[in-house]
């Protein structure tokens, strides 16, 4: 069956993809599509813009499969009841005419087999690390020349986007976030500026770092995430990250969380070592595959 390719989705199609992703998550025990992919469902067609493409496999019974291509990166999901019929392979083949790499969240055996069948190679590991919520974290200590405050909606967007681009200049996803991307996240139910911490120079007011906390779920079952920790390249070594992390841990301790988690590149050995010392362990890896 030939997937339908479109630059935007109707509201009904957007909802059908979300239902499909939820069904796959329930079947597999892991989210099928990333947050950015789900946010992209709502995007209108953008001539000359990001150029997100949607590939759909529909039948009278509903949405059988879905893939998205964004910046050369592919994510896809197949309905649990429609698997083992060649749909995933056909969809991947079509998506890879537009994209270059494909993500496998959790790197499940079926995804590994599909990658092997297309002679794709493993090119990137993104670890998910988790830890028990802190109960008695250290008080954030004063740091010479630095102060920490929280994000102000309507005032800090442009400065944060500039800082983020510098801090993540070599990161293929985080570093390209725009003000529109930030504002889209500000509209999400989980967004809370009170746990969006900014470190700035006490003399100039220049932003030197940020730590964005994301908390989702009901009390007792909620998950706290170190969503994005970035430090200005010229502020490296000043203790900015340590100071911001202390504020995040205090915020986690003040809430009734089931666990805390973060994402880190599998090749970032120094960061992984630091997180392990802080009590984090690897829970899973999301893997990116590409053609040789």
Where does each model-flagged region fall?
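Active-site/acyl-donor-binding loops of N-acyltransferases
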Residues: 118-137, 246-292
């Amino acid at each position: 069956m030939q997937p339908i390719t479109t630059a935007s989705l109707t509201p009904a199609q957007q909802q059908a993809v979300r239902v499909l992703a939820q069904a796959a998550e329930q079947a597999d025990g892991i989210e099928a599509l990333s947050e950015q992919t789900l946010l992209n469902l709502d995007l209108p067609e953008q001539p000359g813009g990001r150029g997100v493409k949607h590939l759909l496999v529909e039948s009278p019974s509903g949405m059988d499969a879905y893939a998205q291509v964004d910046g050369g990166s592919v994510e896809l999901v197949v309905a649990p009841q429609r698997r083992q019929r060649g749909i995933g392979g056909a969809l991947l083949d079509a998506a890879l005419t537009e994209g270059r790499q494909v993500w496998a969240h959790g790197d499940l055996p079926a995804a590994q087999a599909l990658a092997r069948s297309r002679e794709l190679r493993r090119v990137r590991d993104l670890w998910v690390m988790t830890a028990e919520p802190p109960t008695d974290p250290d008080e954030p200590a004063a740091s010479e020349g630095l102060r920490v405050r929280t994000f102000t909606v309507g005032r800090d967007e442009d400065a944060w986007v500039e800082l983020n681009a510098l801090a993540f200049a070599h990161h293929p996803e985080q570093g390209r976030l725009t003000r529109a991307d930030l504002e889209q996240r500000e509209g999400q139910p989980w967004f809370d500026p009170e746990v969006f911490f900014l470190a700035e120079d006490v003399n100039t007011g220049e932003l030197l770092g940020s730590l964005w906390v994301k908390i989702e779920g009901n009390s007792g079952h909620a998950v706290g995430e170190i969503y994005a920790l970035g430090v200005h390249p010229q502020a490296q070594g000043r203790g900015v990250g340590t100071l911001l992390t202390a504020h995040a841990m205090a915020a986690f301790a003040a809430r009734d969380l089931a666990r805390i988690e973060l994402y880190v590149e599998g090749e970032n050995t120094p960061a992984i070592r630091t997180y392990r010392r802080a009590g984090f362990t690897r829970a899973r890896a999301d893997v990116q595959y590409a053609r040789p």
